[in-house]
Amino acid sequence: IWHKEIQDIIVLKNNKGTEDNRVRKLDYSIQLSKLFYERFITNEKITLFSPHDVPGLYDSFGTEFFDELYVRYENNESIPKTRIDAQELILDLLKERAETGRMYLMNIDHCNSHSSFLDKVNMSNLCQEITLPTKPIQHIDDPDGEIALCILSAINVGKINRLDELEDLCDLSVRGLEELIDYQGYPVKAAENSTKKRRSLGIGFIGLAHYLAKNGEHYDDASAWQLTHDLTEAFQYYLLKSSNQLAKEKGKCEYFERTKYSQGILPVSYTHLTLPTTSK
């Protein structure tokens, strides 16, 4: 959001303009952080920079180091910059998103503060539901880089009648995907690196509206919130229980010490603990 060309970027899918300044078939996302929401609310300015003129700003985006560095560069009169009303920029972004669709938003600081990793999350996939650490590769066979892959499955919660039915389903999903990590082929070494050392699994659920209806709740009613909370809490508990059992059987993953789990921090702890800082 703070890139000097952001105003040109957010209109790339707009039907106005010419083929020279539009890329209408490109799908992309825009990263924001708390600082920019605060400036939107208070109707302040956002300062736009070229990443080449502000060393370290790109790497710190999404960490607790960003705000201080950003303000320092704002106050440095020797650095080229453009100031724009925060409300003007963000409302333009939302307008383009509403009119063209498929422009996604990522709250990069929140992704890091609530992730299960001590390593920094830099990016996501298009729909923003996969937030895994990555590391640049210097060439296609670079063994030191990390390309994040997410091994996915979903459980149809509309088919269950009791929360304890999730235990076997979650265990089956975890064990099945765990085997898939070692079974499948990897054409790129950096993808194999990340997947086998982190062993990240993405297990979600479908059929939520069905589940709520079976329990006498409407999808858009506030009374459904507690039911959904209880479902997701049980869902995650059983997934973590299965993962923990696998670690007892096979040993912990190679990068376990690079997770917040290694420090005893679970997702349910996020609102109660001061989290460790992410690495720069």
Indicate where each model-derived feature is located:
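Amphipathic alpha-helical
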Residues: 236-260
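Inter-helical turn/loop segments and adjacent helix faces that build the functional surface
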Residues: 19-20, 81, 159-164, 187-191, ...
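Glycine-rich and small/hydrophobic secondary-structure elements
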Residues: 223-242
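Active-site-adjacent bridging/hinge elements
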Residues: 10, 147-151, 175-187, 212, ...
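Conserved small/polar residues in nucleotide/adenosyl-binding loops
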Residues: 271-277
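Glycine-rich, acidic/polar active-site loops that bind/position phosphate-bearing ligands
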Residues: 84, 147, 153-175
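Core structural elements
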Residues: 180, 194-215
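Active-site cavity-forming subdomains of large catalytic enzyme subunits
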Residues: 1-142, 148-151, 161-162, 190, ...
